[in-house]
């Protein structure tokens, strides 16, 4: 281990130092100031991570005795996660919510976990990062102690999360028993040479833990209740930061460790199809807005799994899809954060066009982008992913079936998006819940998200 190794993890050191400092300073300063300082530390980390990506030489470097490996994939993943974290903290900063200062500190610790997770190259650092995200997330969900729904959601999340962590840890022990090594690079070489029942089962258990965090069917049970009960700011973090990190980590494992074991490919394709069907059809039946988006995100995970299951060639389209929907989710949450944390039903946006035409247009446009209708960015993301999956011949009929499922389930979001649009423009206001007063910060965030979505679409040929 050399001192130069620490230069690579300066973004992580910045976030960790800020979290520890604010944990103490929060007792002597205002919550607003803690929120501002946490945003500054995340912005610094994002700038440093992007700088590391820009100046990356392309040479693979092992750091801290193999616990961290600097590659093109890890540098790119860390930069994407850091920028997503910056978006999440900006939304947190502009949202007119009053939380205790520990909320910002917990978000910093969870953000630190996502940064270390995407660059982990050792099962020990991988699992510790996984748990750091988990423990911070459990507390964020139940932060509103007076809410029964939040407490119920946190208990479900904690119990199922603990179970998934145990399963993952058992899988890691099985893989170690076969490969006699915790390094992901060595494990991938061993599994690529010869398969065994023990190693295959161990990899499957490790993937179960990740699939739980992703919310793929049949490991999605915690998602709807957690989204409904948790503070909206926490949901923002889970959707924008945690999901992005988990997808990028899962993509790395699929390419390096799992793809050589061909039996996993069929399982991934099956879970992709189930996630698309269950997510989109369940979203049609929801009345609560946050539950609806929870199921919609399950459907999006199905699309991502379909892309990753077909091999290395489709990673860039998956990355394009993830970045595009990251920006769309930022766009959507600039509207959702104007409403109360609890009891946000679809009927609460009735007549929004009459009260706030700009907000109504922003909300409906974001929904149409999420549904994947042209000419919005979501359409190009789904089309690019579909084109990439359809161009892979290695897996024959299962891939064809997955393409059919993707096409059919892409139509379903139009139903509930147009239903919400109808409520926004034509229904009579109920008056029970209404959006908070004009929020210039969130409006600017919406404009930035739309602009970046347009830029990403225009530059998609270079990205892919």
From Swiss-Prot:
Protein's cellular compartments: Cell inner membrane
Top-level lineage group: Bacteria
Enzyme class: translocase
Keyword Oxidoreductase among UniProt keywords: no
InterPro entries reported for this sequence: NADH-Q_OxRdtase_suN/2, ND/Mrp_TM
E.C. code: 7.1.1.-
Residue spans crossing the bilayer: 6-26, 36-56, 75-95, 101-121, 123-143, 157-177, 197-217, 231-253, 257-279, 293-313, 317-337, 360-380, 395-415, 439-459
Main location: membrane
One BP term from GO: ATP synthesis coupled electron transport
GO cellular component: plasma membrane
Entry membrane topology: Multi-pass membrane protein
Pfam family, one: Proton_antipo_M
Record key words, sorted: Cell inner membrane, Cell membrane, Membrane, NAD, Quinone, Translocase, Transmembrane, Transmembrane helix, Transport, Ubiquinone
Its biological purpose: NDH-1 shuttles electrons from NADH, via FMN and iron-sulfur (Fe-S) centers, to quinones in the respiratory chain. The immediate electron acceptor for the enzyme in this species is believed to be ubiquinone. Couples the redox reaction to proton translocation (for every two electrons transferred, four hydrogen ions are translocated across the cytoplasmic membrane), and thus conserves the redox energy in a proton gradient.
Name of this protein: NADH-quinone oxidoreductase subunit N
UniProt gene name: nuoN
């Amino acid at each position: 281990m050399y001192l130069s190794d620490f230069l690579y993890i300066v973004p992580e050191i910045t976030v960790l130092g800020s979290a520890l400092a604010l944990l103490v300073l929060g007792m002597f300063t205002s919550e607003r100031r803690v929120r501002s300082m946490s945003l500054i530390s995340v912005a610094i980390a994002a700038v440093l991570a992007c700088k590391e990506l820009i100046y990356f030489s392309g040479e693979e470097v092992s750091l801290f005795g193999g616990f961290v490996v600097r590659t093109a994939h890890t540098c790119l993943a860390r930069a994407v996660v850091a920028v997503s974290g910056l978006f999440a903290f900006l939304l947190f900063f502009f949202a007119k919510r009053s939380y205790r200062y520990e909320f910002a500190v917990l978000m910093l610790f969870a953000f630190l976990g996502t940064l270390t997770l995407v660059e982990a190259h050792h099962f020990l650092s991988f699992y510790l990062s996984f748990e750091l995200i988990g423990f911070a997330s459990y507390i964020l969900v139940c932060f509103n102690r007076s809410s029964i729904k939040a407490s119920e959601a946190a208990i479900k999340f904690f119990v199922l999360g603990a179970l998934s962590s145990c399963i993952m840890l058992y899988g890691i022990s099985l893989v170690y028993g076969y490969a006699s090594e915790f390094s992901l690079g060595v494990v991938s070489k061993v599994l690529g040479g010869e398969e065994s029942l023990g190693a295959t089962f161990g990899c499957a258990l490790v993937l179960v833990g990740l699939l739980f965090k992703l919310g793929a069917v049949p490991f999605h049970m915690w998602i709807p209740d957690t989204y409904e009960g948790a503070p909206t700011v926490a949901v923002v973090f889970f959707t924008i930061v945690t999901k992005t990190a988990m997808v990028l980590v899962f993509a790395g494992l699929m390419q390096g460790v799992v793809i050589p074991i061909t039996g996993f490919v069929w399982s991934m394709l099956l879970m992709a199809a189930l996630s698309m069907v269950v997510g989109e059809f369940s979203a049609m039946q929801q009345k609560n807005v946050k539950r609806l988006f929870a199921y919609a995100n399950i459907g999006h995970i199905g699309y991502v799994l379909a892309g990753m299951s077909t091999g290395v060639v489709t990673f860039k389209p998956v990355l394009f899809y993830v970045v595009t929907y990251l920006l769309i989710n930022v766009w959507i949450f600039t509207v959702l954060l104007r409403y109360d944390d609890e009891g946000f039903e679809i009927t609460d946006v009735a007549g929004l066009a009459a009260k706030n035409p700009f907000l109504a247009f922003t909300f409906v446009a974001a929904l149409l982008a999420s549904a994947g209708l042209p000419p919005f960015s979501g359409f190009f993301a789904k089309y690019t992913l579909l084109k990439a999956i359809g161009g892979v011949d290695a897996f024959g009929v299962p891939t064809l079936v997955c393409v059919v499922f993707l096409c059919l389930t892409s139509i379903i979001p139009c139903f509930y998006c147009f239903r919400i649009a109808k409520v926004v423009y034509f229904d009579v206001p109920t008056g029970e819940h209404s959006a908070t007063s004009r929020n210039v910060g969130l409006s600017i965030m919406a404009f930035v998200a739309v602009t970046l979505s347009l830029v990403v679409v225009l530059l998609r040929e270079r990205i892919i």
